[in-house]
């Protein structure tokens, strides 16, 4: 299928954009009509008659370690210039020229079409020129992605630090709420929205997968030192060793979010991550890693056990941060692993409890406690530590609203499970043990 969109434009100016003295393009408006949104943002496989590109944008600035919204609005292609380029000209003139170059900005785009290969190239050059920007691009539909040049430049976007993803229900709802003259009405998903999202998402994953393979020339790219994980936009390879790509901030906030998810569709976005830090008693630097279970394959906990077994370690302390508590099978395998290694100290923190009301899952948690594994719920100190070690040590963690309240509720729920199985005293005994290397 060949999408319908304006053809390539000629005569783009030099970079930095805006220094070319082109006329400044302005947003068409802050809000678009419901009819325009439903027609142009519908994530169809074949989008007949949709030649225009709409770009809804939000610009935030970091102020005293907190994000502050500066601008939001809507661009549309104009004078044969695509919406993305119109935005970049506008952003240069209205933001970069006005505010200090030391300011840090986050830009979020919600687009009816993903960038064409020429726009993607221009965006890459713009990001390379301005290192104080971060850019997230969510697209309703993929434009001409069968073209090798388009695929290559989408990859270059990711390699330059942009986040590129397909719009899911969460993004459609957010876009509807902020950029549509909705008259107070809630967003009503159209038929096959989620099905079409999964198709667009899988195509994008396939295109971007090579972007995330990063093996240093001095490292061996064997299966033993490559861990598979996913992120936004999904699949990524991380290399264990001195240099490890961190989780993106967007990934962390969406995947470790500890509050109750009201809509079933959002559960498809909640992935089972396992971040671990291994500290040895011989003074060596801690080892870190992040794992994610693939659908239909081994869970992250099993990948973690295989990794630790291959190291043949004895006296170590391991801290794990999980987005979901282990399933019964993973719990029993973790428990068996711990019983075979009494000198190993394993502490598991989980953001959310997985099927905690079902007896087999409760029994799995009990097997962890009975084996001597410490299982607890992530609270603000753990979220902060996870952020520092696996996301961005240079930026402070900004807690979401209600984080500590929800953590305490989840802790009470976990405590009730312990009490219902008569394990509270046992867990308290483990908590009072002196954990550490033998005293000389």
Swiss-Prot record:
Alphabetical keyword list: Antiviral defense, Cytoplasm, Hydrolase, Immunity, Innate immunity, Metal-binding, Repeat, Zinc
Which Enzyme Commission numbers does its entry carry?
A: 3.5.4.38
One GO term in the molecular function aspect is: hydrolase activity
Q: State how changing residue 269 to G affects the protein, per the record.
A: In cell line L1.2
Which InterPro entries does its entry note?
A: APOBEC/CMP_deaminase_Zn-bd (IPR016192), APOBEC_Cyt_Deaminase (IPR050610), CMP_dCMP_dom (IPR002125), Cytidine_deaminase-like (IPR016193)
Would you say which domain of life the source belongs to? Eukaryota
Where, by residue number, does Zn(2+) bind? 82, 116, 119, 299, 327, 330
Q: What happens after mutating residue 150 to N?
A: In cell line L1.2
Effect of changing residue 139 to F: reported as: In cell line MDTF
The reported result of mutating residue 31 to V is: In cell line MDTF
Q: What residues make up the catalytic site?
A: 84
Report the record's Gene Ontology biological process terms. defense response to virus; hematopoietic progenitor cell differentiation; innate immune response; negative regulation of viral genome replication; regulation of defense response to virus; regulation of viral life cycle; transposable element silencing
Q: Which Gene3D superfamilies match?
A: Cytidine Deaminase, domain 2 (3.40.140.10)
* Free-text function comment from the UniProt entry: DNA deaminase (cytidine deaminase) which acts as an inhibitor of retrovirus replication and retrotransposon mobility via deaminase-dependent and -independent mechanisms. Selectively targets single-stranded DNA and does not deaminate double-stranded DNA or single- or double-stranded RNA. Exhibits antiviral activity against HIV-1, simian immunodeficiency viruses (SIVs), mouse mammary tumor virus (MMTV) and friend murine leukemia virus (FrMLV) and may inhibit the mobility of LTR retrotransposons.
Q: What else is known?
A: Probable human APOBEC3G ortholog.
Subunit record text: Homodimer. Interacts with mouse mammary tumor virus (MMTV) nucleocapsid protein p14.
What name is this protein filed under? DNA dC->dU-editing enzyme APOBEC-3
Instruction: List the source organism.
Output: Mus musculus (Mouse)
């Amino acid at each position: 299928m060949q999408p319908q969109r304006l053809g390539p434009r000629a005569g783009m100016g030099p970079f930095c954009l805006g220094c070319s003295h082109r006329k400044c393009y302005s947003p068409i408006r802050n809000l678009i009509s419901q009819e325009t949104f439903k027609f142009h943002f519908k994530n169809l496989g074949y989008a007949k008659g949709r030649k225009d590109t709409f770009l809804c944008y939000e610009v935030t600035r970091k102020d005293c370690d907190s994000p502050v919204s500066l601008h939001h609005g809507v661009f549309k292609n104009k004078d044969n210039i695509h919406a993305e380029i119109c935005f970049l000209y506008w952003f240069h003139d209205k933001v970069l020229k006005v505010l200090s170059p030391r300011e840090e900005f986050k830009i979020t785009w919600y687009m009816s079409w993903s960038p064409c290969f020429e726009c993607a190239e221009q965006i890459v050059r713009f990001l390379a020129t301005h290192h104080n920007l971060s850019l997230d691009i969510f697209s309703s539909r993929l434009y001409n992605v069968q073209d090798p040049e388009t695929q290559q430049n989408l990859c270059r976007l990711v390699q330059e630090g942009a986040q590129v993803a397909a719009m899911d229900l969460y993004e459609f709802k957010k876009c509807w709420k902020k950029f549509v003259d909705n008259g107070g009405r809630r967003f009503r998903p159209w038929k096959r929205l989620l099905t079409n999202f999964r198709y667009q998402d899988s195509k994008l994953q396939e295109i971007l997968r090579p972007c995330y393979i990063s093996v240093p020339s001095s490292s061996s790219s064997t299966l033993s030192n490559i861990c598979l994980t996913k992120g936004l936009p999904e699949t990524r390879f991380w290399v264990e060793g001195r240099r490890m790509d961190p989780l993106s901030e967007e990934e962390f906030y969406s995947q470790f979010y500890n509050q109750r998810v009201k809509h079933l569709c959002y559960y498809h976005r909640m992935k089972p991550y396992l971040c671990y830090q291994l500290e040895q008693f011989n003074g060596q630097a801690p080892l870190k890693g992040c794992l994610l279970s693939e659908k239909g394959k081994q869970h992250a906990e099993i990948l973690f056990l295989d990794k630790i077994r291959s190291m043949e370690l004895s006296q170590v302390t391991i801290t794990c941060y999980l987005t979901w508590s282990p399933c019964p099978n993973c719990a029993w395998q973790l428990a068996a692993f711990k019983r075979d290694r009494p000198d190993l100290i394993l502490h598991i923190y989980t953001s959310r409890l997985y099927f905690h009301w079902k007896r087999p899952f409760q029994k799995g948690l009990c097997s962890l406690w009975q084996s001597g594994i410490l299982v607890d719920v992530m609270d603000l100190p753990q979220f902060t530590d996870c952020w520092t070690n696996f996301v961005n040590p240079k930026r402070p963690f900004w807690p979401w609203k209600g984080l500590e309240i929800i953590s305490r509720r989840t802790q009470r729920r976990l405590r009730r499970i312990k009490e219902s199985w008569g394990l509270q005293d046992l867990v308290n005994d483990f908590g009072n043990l002196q954990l550490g290397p033998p005293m000389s």
